[in-house]
């Protein structure tokens, strides 16, 4: 599914509820440059075999929120620029992300200027470190923020 919708700049909404992603290993750049995409429901995605999520949502500049709490990322090796340049993204749930096998997280949140600490849910220390590489305001929930 690499680059499947890449460059679909007029695309505003997608219904992917019937997509069978059970055997997919690469979501790299899947929605790259879908600059008009405002919402995306990926709750039916089976991601247990995925190894590459690099650039998956890169330059989705109209996307405001994403709930990826259902994503199984235990086999993912690359998340570089996954949300890069998602300049309107204000809310993100990646609470179940597991980055133990990930070797590339650089620029995961580069130019995500609208992303606020109170609207991101994360539980992984490596992702927290990447968040802090562009903003020092992110903390874990035990430090009294909504990031877990």
Regions found by a protein language model. Name each.
Residues 1-148:
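Negatively charged
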